[in-house]
């Protein structure tokens, strides 16, 4: 098994540009086969515009993040919006479930499943925080260029607009 693990680490390293040693360390405590991490992204609309958060690295993204082990998809999405944008929202509809490798720019060693969730704004005000320097609402034709494409792409934001414009739209999935 040790030889197989070494070969797997080399393969992942080649595909992701992460050093073999780092990949090896990432999986040293794992037992069983690998399963994907879950990332949730919120689509919050106000006046027909979508909420994006401006991250401290200078890129824009839908609010969201890794799903904590004690959270559901809905509760994690609501929690992430509160942490990043200061808003209390209600998760109302699952827009899409996507395989990260098929839609996002990444060299991450793990598999990731992304859940996009339509959320209704309830209350709150933004305050700059450790992750977010500002927030803004953008129209479909106003989406900024500097997106955190490992988190959300222009196409994924447009997909959220389509779900907003067509509430009867079925959940999309890979």
Give, region by region, the residue ranges found by the protein language model.
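Acidic, metal-coordinating catalytic segment for phosphate/diphosphate chemistry
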Residues: 2-41
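Glycine-rich active-site/cofactor-binding loop and its immediate structural neighborhood
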Residues: 29-78
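Conserved positions in beta-strands of structured domains
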Residues: 45, 92-95
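Residue-level "edge-of-site" marker
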Residues: 56, 94-97
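Unchanged
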Residues: 67-91, 99-156, 172-174
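Acidic/histidine-enriched, glycine/proline-rich intrinsically disordered or flexible terminal extensions
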Residues: 162-174
């Amino acid at each position: 098994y040790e030889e197989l693990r070494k070969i797997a680490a080399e393969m992942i390293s080649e595909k992701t540009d992460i050093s073999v040693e780092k990949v090896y360390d990432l999986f040293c405590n794992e037992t069983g086969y690998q399963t994907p991490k879950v990332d949730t992204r919120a689509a919050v609309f106000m006046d027909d515009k979508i909420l994006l958060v401006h991250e401290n690295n200078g890129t824009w993204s839908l609010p969201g993040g890794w799903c904590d082990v004690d959270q559901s998809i809905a509760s994690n999405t609501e929690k992430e919006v509160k942490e990043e944008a200061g808003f209390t929202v209600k998760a109302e509809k699952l827009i899409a479930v996507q395989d990260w490798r098929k839609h996002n720019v990444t060299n991450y060693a793990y598999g990731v499943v992304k859940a996009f969730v339509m959320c209704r704004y309830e209350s709150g005000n933004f305050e700059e925080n450790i992750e977010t320097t500002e927030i803004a609402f953008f129209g479909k034709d106003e989406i900024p260029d500097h997106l955190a494409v490992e988190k959300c792409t222009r196409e994924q934001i447009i997909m959220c607009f389509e779900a907003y414009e067509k509430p009867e739209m079925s959940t999309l999935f890979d």
